Amino acid sequence: MEEEQLRYSRRLRHTLRRRYEDDGISDDEIEGKRTFDLEEKLRSSKYNSNFITYMEGKDFNMKFIQEGGLRDPIIFTKSEGLGIKMPDPNFSVNDVKMFVGSRRVVDVMDVGTQKGIEMTMAQWAKYYETPEEEREKLYNVISLEFSHTKLENLVQRPTTVDQIDWVDNIWPRHLKDRQTESTNVIQEMQYPKVQKYCLMSVRGCYTDFHVDFGGTSVWYHILRGGKVFWLIPPTDQNLELYENWLLSGKQGDVFLGDRVTECQRIELKQGYTFVIPSGWIHAVYTPQDTLVFGGNFLHSFNIPMQLRIYSIEDRTRVPTKFRYPFYYEMCWYVLERYVYCMMRRSHLTKEFQRESLSIDLELNGRQRPDTPSSSSSSSSSGLSSSSDNDDSSDQDWEEEEGLRKRERDRCRVERELQRKRNRDRQQRDQERDRHGRTERIIIHTLPASLRPLTPPPSLPLPTPDSPPSTSPFLTWFEVEGLRCLVLKLESLPPLKKCLPDGIHDPEALIFDIKRLLEDHAHDPPELALTGVPIIQWPKRSQYKVHLRPKIQFTKPHTMRPASRHSTAPPRTSGTPSGTTASSGARRRRVRCRKCQACVQRECGTCHYCKDMKKFGGPGRMKQSCVLRQCLAPRLPHSVTCALCGEVDQTNDTQDFERKLMECSVCNEIVHPGCLEMDGEGLLSDELPNYWECPKCYEGQKHTVEANHDRILLHSKRKAADNYESSHYYPAKVLRPPLGQSPPSPPLLLLPPSPSSAPPTPPSAQTQVPLASREERAKRRQLAREKENHPTGCDQSEGDRLRLRGPYLTVTLQRPPKELSSTSIVPKLQAITPNPRQPIRAAPLHQDEEREEEEEEEEEEEETENVMLGQRKDSTSMQKDVWLSVFHYLTHEELCICMRVCKAWYKWGCDKRLWSRIDVSRCKSLVPQALSGIIKRQPIYLDLSWTNVSKKQLIWLINRLPGLKDLILAGCTWSAVSALASCSCPLLRTLDLRWTVGIKDTQIRDLLTPASDKSGHDSRSKLRLLTDLRLSGLDISDVTLRLIIRHCPLLSKLDLSHCPLLSDQSVNLLTAVGSSTRGTLTHIHLAGCKGVTDESLLYLRRATNLSLIDLHGCKQVTRGACEEFISDLSVSTLYCLSDDKLIQRIS
């Protein structure tokens, strides 16, 4: 009986720990089966209220929404007139898998526990096709969002839903266009991606009462099968009951439909379309296998209910994963869109105006009627103002947009007239004094420079007698909703306002929306029922800006070369070909299909092959095998000559002049015979049809010769100056352009003395990064020129060209400098392999200015070389010095240092600095964290109390061959089971304390040799364990026998709080022939209720014990411990602490 109680208590503890580790406890994670009879709820006749409205599709339009605000559920038995588009009724789950991808991960709900798990579409399709009698559990998919997949084109929502959905009409549309990720990963989401869902349920699935996230409304089409709904209206009393029901945690015991006064059960059949308004509480049952398409949407005609549902989600702590994304950001954009569409004033940033509204004032150089600076005035004077300076381009554009402008002007005049009538009627009835109405209108009038452009003379100005057009009046639902929305956003604390990036000035936006609500507080309802939505995006074709210069993008393998008449102008003789822009992009070459690499098969082992789908990979790299990379790729057949426009007319055995050749410098492809110039080219052996054309080759030769002459002249001048002044300093030569080597080695100029030392060869000179030395040379040259020309006299043209041109002065030798051996900070001097010796004695007379310049230059070079690691000859020693410094930093400080530069980042990832990595108690291990662990190759890895999965752990251990110590305390067996594979490294420490779900069977799987690969090592992967921690596990003597057999080197064993262990367990560990008898040095038996004084008699056999932990063992007395110490005092001295901790002294 006591053993059964222990097992029951352990089971409770496991359940509590699993719920504690989950990220929040929601209504989707409540464990335990329901206690009410669902079959009785399906047969009961008390759910007979009547809330449903049956309609035809043609009646569900914008005018219907404006009249009723979409408050009641609607059923359409036929889809005609709705504007929806659906696949054929025989569309199956396998078809869904084909369109969204078999690897797509979907959230699956366990109907029995109402807890969510994850499956791939391939796994779900296999489960769905399994016969009903073979299904062990009931699973339900209710959240497969398939926008931006191939399935998206097969499903179209009702037309009216498209007209009122905030995502389509409110959210900046350029953000939606940027969405590329098909899944609902919040990090990659550019807009609220909740518009199209696929729901797949098997017979018997049940989803408990809930309200759709964020108070969204739902459209729902039954493609196959059927559904049963229980509907509860969103009254104040019902919503309060629903909130208390969620917080009670008794969803499995209470059927919410029995607690409310009114509830309706309705059955939906195949082909039905169902619309659930905002806030309606509903439960769903699936009487047969069903495939449903639907979606969620927010709209402007029930904003108060949407806000209330979102507040309920706040109070019930619904996890972010199950909530409407970007909710408050969407609310801000709602206010902005209403202000823009009603007042023609935009509060978006310039970028958002350009991308979503197609407004680009900076490029056009003029105002557009729909820009933020357009007037929102409704007075007729604002319409009659015009500018006399409108050019012809403005009039052309206005003629193009005349119809739309005329309609907008008529709406403005009609609205003004209606407001005047309202004011007169209200004054006559003496209900309210509207004297301030005119003042508000005057406030809205903008300066003449910001008013709309006057229509062209061909378009008459709107008059009061003009026929009425679509009225921009607001319905009562919109006015009340916007007022609630403003109050909600103003009441939010600053950190929860969630102001989006596209809003420029939120205070001005709030001010304008309040004025808008004041102006439209008494709009006549009959004029607001127009059947036309107020919030609409302007058509991009009408507002497309053509003034930005177009940039031509060309693909190298598809680009046709320019014709002969459109070739680039010839280069000047003074400009080398290597410094000019290439005449065209280099063409992408194709396989020759003749070499050995092209004809052989894939190896199947390289990283490219492993990525291929035919070898089981994801197919993302889209690269060919490493062994199949062509050795001589040829030009594609589509390439033509840039001069004559003809293709290659020859093969390898015919005339060379008709063979297409590609230049390695300018990338131009021509026939050699088409070049009308005399000269010689340079053939290349690297690729077929590859050469250096005569234009580039001849130009390069002339450039080299010119450079050579200039260097000689410059050297002669320097030598003459040296001889006259008897000064000794290194010569400065002009560096040729990048990619060209100097024609002759640099010479060290010495004064004519018979005792002077021979010049040092170039290989002995200290190499300096060219870019940094060029910059310093420029700075010094400019400083000297300022000193030489204090009155601002002009420099010579040659000096200016020398500073700006491609030829820059570079010092090839530096004077020696004493090294400091006591420097602590690692600098260049400390890491140079051999100290630099002076080439010759120092000169007797040296210019002081030159000495200061060289010292400053040397210090700058040393600092740059040390920080950026630019000295190749001392890189390894430099790294070792910095690593010795990095060893004193914590991991947090080291991560900060890694942001300094690329060299520090590379050195900071050295595995010697990361031998121990501790990520314990991290809420989530993202892929970037796992990649960082792999990059650092730790020896000790602590993953305790994390939610690491089996897949993640397998990925880690496969890439950490040097891992020795692994800490998995507090994890689950599903993750720890990854160690049972043959790829597990040879660990020396394994910590499995308080791991959920581990018993004797699981320990056997870990310790026995892996059998997942045939012919593998028959020994256990944990045979080198020296430290094993099994505290808090339900293990017995079976586990101890496995440890004795498979862990011969075990020295530390932690068996604390294992309730099934007894004195016989200790006897096994110290029995004759047991490997642990001679290897154990530390044994922990704290909290083991079955251990008594008899265990100490068995522990005397272990000759190497240094620590015995018995605290919490109630059946072990202190007297027995003292007796144990006294009996062993002859050979070994022990001491006893107050907590029954026996430690070895000598």
UniProtKB/Swiss-Prot annotation:
Family annotation (PANTHER family): PHD/F-BOX CONTAINING PROTEIN
Q: What is the lineage of its organism?
A: Eukaryota, Metazoa, Chordata, Craniata, Vertebrata
Organism of origin is Xenopus tropicalis
Q: What class of enzyme is it?
A: oxidoreductase
Cofactors needed by this protein, per the record, are: Fe(2+)
Q: Where is this region: Disordered?
A: 363-467, 554-585, 733-800, 832-867
Short name of any one Pfam family annotated for the protein:
zf-CXXC
Q: Specify the protein name.
A: Lysine-specific demethylase 2A
Q: Which Gene3D superfamilies does the entry mention?
A: 1.20.58.1360, Cupin, Ribonuclease Inhibitor, Zinc/RING finger domain, C3HC4 (zinc finger)
From start to end residue, where is composition biased (Acidic residues)? 388-401, 849-864
Pro residues bias: where?
453-467, 739-762
In what ranges is there compositional bias, type Low complexity?
Answer: 373-387, 566-584
